[in-house]
Structure formats: structure tokens, C-alpha cells
Amino acid sequence: MNTRFLLLLCCLSFTAFSQPFDALKQPNRSEEEVTQLAEDFKDWSKASNDWRYSFITANEKEAVEDFSISGYQTANDYLRATDTSTWGVAGADARQYIRTVKSALNKLPKYKGTTYRGTWVKQSLLNKLEEGDVLVEPAFTSTSTLPEVAKRFSVVHPNSPQRLKRVLFKVKVNQGGHTIAGLSEYSKEAEVLFAPNAHFRITQIERTSNHTYIGVETVKASAAKNTQKYNLYSGEEVEASFWHSLVCT
């Protein structure tokens, strides 16, 4: 790891701040600075491609490019659906697309460090969460090395009958994160993507009137045994049978 990238990580991750969520609470940096940091991350992503990248196919590249535009919607809708039996041909297409994106991720650079995610989560789930609990995301999980980008995704309240609250995640990436900045159509997002069924252990929670800040770290499924687990999307407790299927697939 060269000196330039170490300096870049310091800038991206706001490591100079002493409090866990300072990077998410500080005023946004200028658009020019954020754009430059995203370009630097894109350059690093391309430079970090190893021998695996030589095996990436044209279909896989196209799938990742499409994922950042609109493909994520179909893929994640399918992965989060409680019943996919009615999807028909669209379901078969979705499954093939998901397999292609997952295959591409395995050939893209791994990322370890800090990322951020902004989203909306059911209030009923937030009321139950405690430090040490594990969140399981059945869909792909998009994060960014730039807190400014993460915050943009939690501005507009989704159209949902559920009571939702804005949540900003700080993610310590130990495993499972792959940068798609070198392929994504939205390279300015400095995106780090996780495959379906990523596991995030809660390390810190800070609740305010407008936001909930949650610090998490990625963990292996096998390391989350005997731990309270929740489906991040549905808010439901992950039961043993479902948990077993995640471990075995």
C-alpha cells in the first residue's frame, strides 16, 4: 500500500476526528473537493485491479455498470421479496443478473477501511437495536468512502406506509467490500459494494431527534452465531432456519 493511498484513506475516512460520528456530523466539504476525492478513489480502484480482473467478462462489466444506474432496483427488490413465485420470467432474469453481479464483485478490488451509508430504517427495528446485535441485509449493500455521498441518500423520505427514520451508518469494512468505482457509471460516488446477505455487527448507536447514527463492522456469518440478528430491510428477527440457510448458501 503506497503513501499516496494511505493519505487518501485518511482524507476519505476522516480519521483525524476523535468522535465516532464526526465525519457524518461535520459540514460537507466543497463539491470540488468531494469530486476530486472521488476521482482519486476511482484511480486507486483501477490501479488496484489484480489478476482476477483479467477474468472479468464483458457481460459482468456491463452488469456492474447497469447496477449503478437502475439494475440495483430490480436486483434488490427480488432479493428482499418474501415471495418470488409470482415473478415468472422476470424472476429468472433477476436471478441471472444477480449471479452476474456477484461474480463480477469477486474479480474487483477488495476494500478495507471505513465507508458510510445513508438510508431509512423502520422505527420499530431501531427501537429494538442494541450494541452487539447483527444486521443482515438480504440485498446488495451500497456504501461510499465519502460521508457527503452517503448523506445524499437519506434526504428524501421514501413513500412508505411504515414509520421510518433517517439512519446514517459508519461501516468498518473488515471483509466483503469491493470497490466498483472503476466500472460504475456513477464513479463520483466512490462506491464500495457488498454482496447479498452481508452481516454487520453494531458497535455504537447514537440516537437524536432527526437522525440515528449507527456504527457497524462487517463480520462473517459464522462469527455471528449466538447473537441477536435482524433483517435490516424487514426489521424482523432472523430465525434459526433462515440463519441456517444463509450459512449454507
Model-flagged regions — what are they?
Residues 19-249:
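Mono-ADP-ribosyltransferase
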Residues 13-15:
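N-terminal signal peptide c-region/cleavage motif recognized by signal peptidases
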Residues 9-11, 195:
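A broadly tuned, weak detector of single residues within folded domains
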Residues 2-8:
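Sec-dependent signal peptide recognition
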Residues 8-9, 246:
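Secreted/extracellular small peptides and ectodomain modules produced from precursors
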